[in-house]
Amino acid sequence: MANHSQLGFQDASSPIMEELVEFHDHALIVALAICSLVLYLLAHMLMEKLSSNAVDAQEVELIWTILPAIVLVLLALPSLQILYMMDEIDEPDLTLKAIGHQWYWSYEYTDFKDLSFDSYMIPTTDLPNGHFRLLEVDHRVVVPMESPIRVIITAGDVLHSWAVPTLGVKTDAIPGRLNQTSFIATRPGVFYGQCSEICGANHSYMPIVVESTPLPYFETWSSLLSAS
């Protein structure tokens, strides 16, 4: 999760997030190059004497037309690749349904006969020592690591948004509509997110906690939860 005074992204825990971080660095390099060029030209114009001679500058016009087009292509190609990757859902090992409510989340594991629960934020007064304020929940979403997970997202009342930054996931939850996304958790851990669509007075109290575990631990957890 994010640390205090952190300026960069959270550590990537999925292939999609790794691609997003690389694209951010790529776009930042392009932006810095453009800013450096503009600042150099401004400094050059300020220090050099200007000539009032009007000349035909077809070469300059050609350069400032073609160069921005090349820059846009360099930004568009990796962006389109990531967009297609985010929309691709290829034979998921597990399907999870997330339903947004005011102000909690409900989860259903559709591959299991009877595995569903509600996930509420733990109030600050009940929070154990060492846990994170406004981010901990009473029931975490547990998924097997290194497995394709499909998440079907909807809402039961107003607009919500299911977002876990370290997994590179953010999908709107819309009443009467099913949206879907997917991710692969590449390492074990606990990943925190929050509702990312203003949904009412307690919008800030809708945390999301995804716990990635090895497959044997997930199977044990699902068996115990189904039995209870």
From Swiss-Prot:
Keywords, ordered alphabetically: Copper, Electron transport, Magnesium, Membrane, Metal-binding, Mitochondrion, Mitochondrion inner membrane, Respiratory chain, Translocase, Transmembrane, Transmembrane helix, Transport
Cofactor detail note: Binds a dinuclear copper A center per subunit.
Cofactor(s) needed for function: Cu cation
EC number of the protein: 7.1.1.9
Binding site for Cu cation A1: 160, 195, 199, 206
CDD domains referenced in this protein's UniProt entry, alphabetically: CcO_II_C (cd13912)
Catalytic activity: 4 Fe(II)-[cytochrome c] + O2 + 8 H(+)(in) = 4 Fe(III)-[cytochrome c] + 2 H2O + 4 H(+)(out)
GO cellular component: mitochondrial inner membrane; respiratory chain complex IV
Topology class, membrane: Multi-pass membrane protein
A Pfam family assignment: COX2_TM
Mitochondrial matrix topological segments: 46-58
Binding site for Cu cation A2: 195, 197, 199, 203
Transmembrane segments: 15-45, 59-86
A molecular function GO annotation: cytochrome-c oxidase activity
Subcellular location: Mitochondrion inner membrane
InterPro entries listed in its UniProt record: CcO_II, CcO_II-like_C, CcO_II_C, Copper_CuA, Cupredoxin, Cyt_c_oxidase_su2, Cyt_c_oxidase_su2_TM_dom, Cyt_c_oxidase_su2_TM_sf
SUPFAM superfamilies, A to Z: Cupredoxins, Cytochrome c oxidase subunit II-like, transmembrane region
UniProt-listed Gene3D superfamilies: 1.10.287.90, Cupredoxins - blue copper proteins
Highest taxon above the source species: Eukaryota
Binding site for Mg(2+): 197
Functional description taken from the UniProt entry: Component of the cytochrome c oxidase, the last enzyme in the mitochondrial electron transport chain which drives oxidative phosphorylation. The respiratory chain contains 3 multisubunit complexes succinate dehydrogenase (complex II, CII), ubiquinol-cytochrome c oxidoreductase (cytochrome b-c1 complex, complex III, CIII) and cytochrome c oxidase (complex IV, CIV), that cooperate to transfer electrons derived from NADH and succinate to molecular oxygen, creating an electrochemical gradient over the inner membrane that drives transmembrane transport and the ATP synthase.
Protein family: Belongs to the cytochrome c oxidase subunit 2 family.
Entry-linked NCBIfam families: CoxB
Subunit: Component of the cytochrome c oxidase (complex IV, CIV), a multisubunit enzyme composed of 14 subunits. The complex is composed of a catalytic core of 3 subunits MT-CO1, MT-CO2 and MT-CO3, encoded in the mitochondrial DNA, and 11 supernumerary subunits COX4I, COX5A, COX5B, COX6A, COX6B, COX6C, COX7A, COX7B, COX7C, COX8 and NDUFA4, which are encoded in the nuclear genome.
Protein name, entry field: Cytochrome c oxidase subunit 2
UniProt organism field: Cairina moschata (Muscovy duck)
